[in-house]
Amino acid sequence: MKLFKRFKWIIVVVFMLVAMGALLLIVNHNRLHTNTNLSNFKIDKLKIGSKINKHKFERHDDVLLKKFYVYSMVDHPDFILLVNKRSGKVVGMSLLNDKDLQTNCNWKIGDDISKVKVSMDANYKEKSLHNGFKSLIFIDKKHKIKLFIVHKENKIKKIEIHNK
């Protein structure tokens, strides 16, 4: 009988610890990933979910993906788009090394990273990458969009946005 009572208390204590651990994980996950509205974020008048003008873009048939086509702008080959094969809508954009194109927030490649921090919400996560690069990550939970801004020495090097 004493053995049964001892096991009962052990089971209750283990259950309480697991419940508190799960609660702590949920609270930390929601606190770390605060929301930023990215549904209207544009690079050169294009946003996630829009259709592209195929006359301005060329498709890369050498890149084979199951669900997506890869396009780049004819005039700006460093502006790359991922387009859903079924819907024809943009699901991802990447801008690298092209200082002519800018976002609707009035920043572009080569600008100071403080422009990004001022124009966007303070709801970002900063990560250190290799070779001195860092990234700012903005998450839009409602529209399921992620924005990555890669920078080095406080200068924007890459802008990437895509559906989660």
Segments predicted by a language model, with ranges:
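Acidic/histidine-rich, surface-exposed loop or edge segments in extracytoplasmic proteins
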Residues: 36-39, 92-102
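N-proximal short alpha-helices
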Residues: 24, 28, 89-90
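A cross-family detector of function-defining hotspots
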Residues: 40, 45-87, 99, 107-155, ...
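N-terminal Sec-pathway targeting helices
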Residues: 1-19, 26
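Ser/Thr/Pro/Gly-rich low-complexity linker/stalk segments immediately outside membranes or between
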Residues: 26-47
